[in-house]
Amino acid sequence: MILSQQKYNYLAKVSDSNGVISALAFDQRGALKCLMAQYQMKEPTVAQMEELKVLVSEELTPYASSILLDPEYGLPAAQARDREAGLLLAYEKTGYDANTTSRLPDCLVDWSIKRLKEAGADAVKFLLYYDVDGDPQVNVQKQAYIERIGSECQAEDIPFFLEILTYDETISNNSSVEFAKVKVHKVNDAMKVFSAERFGIDVLKVEVPVNMVYVEGFAEGEVVYSKEEAAQAFREQEASTDLPYIYLSAGVSAELFQETLVFAHKAGAKFNGVLCGRATWAGSVQVYMEEGKEAARQWLRTSGLQNINELNKVLKTTASPWTEKVSVG
């Protein structure tokens, strides 16, 4: 893949010195509200959401190559990040319409790539829900939407990270055995679609191609994939794209995510880092809501720091530098 010099420089800012993206994800909005709402009767306030994001940014960005935030609640946290840490900003509205299976994408209406760049972004992230077997007319709309964002990023000469969350229009539960059986195809074929040059994507942020809780040796209940079938799924994922790609943590535990990265590497996946969210900071939410700011800070300085240090240690031996996949032109 050929990158402009400026895009290359921006990507270097969100990566570590080895060319690996060890980024912290805290662009959650709807999901964060739901997490916080478990611990108080009324809806979480803007001030609470902003303050927790600031705490996580202050305490954990010294140990991350960059942080992904949203411009709705995350700009104070962007200002609070470590000066060596890069900044990715999310461009999509949170959530989707649960009354339809189409899950059409939507940008934040008062933002543009130009404005995100002016707010200090080193890269822009957009989340897309995609079913490769879904309604063809819906998928054409989604592809056209991504082309527009790719063109915007090209015009502003800023890296475009596309996050693909796969689903099946006919399966309501992504954690089910039923979805686990089709996940390899859903994830890897979506990556093939969006690796086309026309979309202007620089980095894919993707799911691992199997649900690890159904993999032999990891499963506590039903097994959907043998270890070899799971390893083959990771090899097929590696063959699905020439673009740099990074893994999202999908809300699994820190321990399972780290074990997954080791498994992926052994299988032959040359992934280029992670954008890890809840696996790192989720435990701070309850502490913040029940015990307050300083208790949450203490949790982040102990458990949160341990999570991110352990993840960084795993990345050192499993992730490949994206610099091997790109050249400047």
From Swiss-Prot:
EC number annotated for this UniProt entry: 4.1.2.40
Similarity annotation: Belongs to the aldolase LacD family.
GO molecular function: 6-deoxy-6-sulfofructose-1-phosphate aldolase activity; tagatose-6-phosphate kinase activity; tagatose-bisphosphate aldolase activity
Superkingdom classification of source: Bacteria
HAMAP family xref list: LacD
Coiled-coil spans in chain: none
One Pfam family recorded for the sequence: DeoC
Disulfide bridge positions per record: none
Name of the protein in its database record: Tagatose 1,6-diphosphate aldolase 2
Species in which this protein is naturally found: Streptococcus mutans serotype c (strain ATCC 700610 / UA159)
SUPFAM superfamilies: Aldolase (SSF51569)
Chemical reaction(s) catalysed: D-tagatofuranose 1,6-bisphosphate = D-glyceraldehyde 3-phosphate + dihydroxyacetone phosphate
